Amino acid sequence: MLKNSLKIALFFSFLFAPNARSALNIGVIAPLAGEYQKVGEELVSGVRTAVDEINSQGGLKGEKINLIMVDDQCDDRIAVSTAQMMAVNVSERDKMSLVIGPYCSNALQKIAGIYAKAGILQIIPTSVSTSIQNGNYKGLVKMV
């Protein structure tokens, strides 16, 4: 299901991506070390499989997808600085079209507004936090 959802999200992120980009940048924010490492690696693996499949078929309308992975260690401070890096303090060419994550709920409320303000689609594949609902932030989709 995540694979199909990712394909749909990538399609819509492509529709709204600025024309100046030569590729779509997709960020994955997940714990890649520590207590939740296994889950983070599985999330990254699933996204990588979908991206590889899309790229092997020529990308989306000829645009390849760049996958950028960030280990947030389930630390909300790292997630916030990552959001700033991916959404605010970056050129239009390097800005993310889509961000998947974070895995851990503790950072979700702090970063959702950053991505929404930057117009970046965000998929939350695992968070069960009730502090944020899909309608509260433009471009936020919770899978759980």
Language-model regions: role of each:
Residues 60-75, 136-140:
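Short beta-strand elements in bilobed, periplasmic/extracellular small-molecule ligand-binding domains
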Residues 27-48, 70-77, 103:
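Extracytoplasmic "Venus flytrap"
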Residues 44, 48-51, 79-84, 96, ...:
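Extracytoplasmic/secreted envelope proteins and their assembly/folding machinery
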Residues 88, 93-144:
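Extracytoplasmic ligand/sensor domains, especially the bilobed periplasmic-binding protein
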Residues 2-11:
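Sec-dependent signal peptide recognition
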Residues 69, 76-97:
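Short, well-structured alpha-helical segments in soluble
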Residues 44-67, 91-94:
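Signal peptide-proximal N-terminal region
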Residues 18-22:
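Sec/Tat signal peptide C-region and signal peptidase I cleavage site
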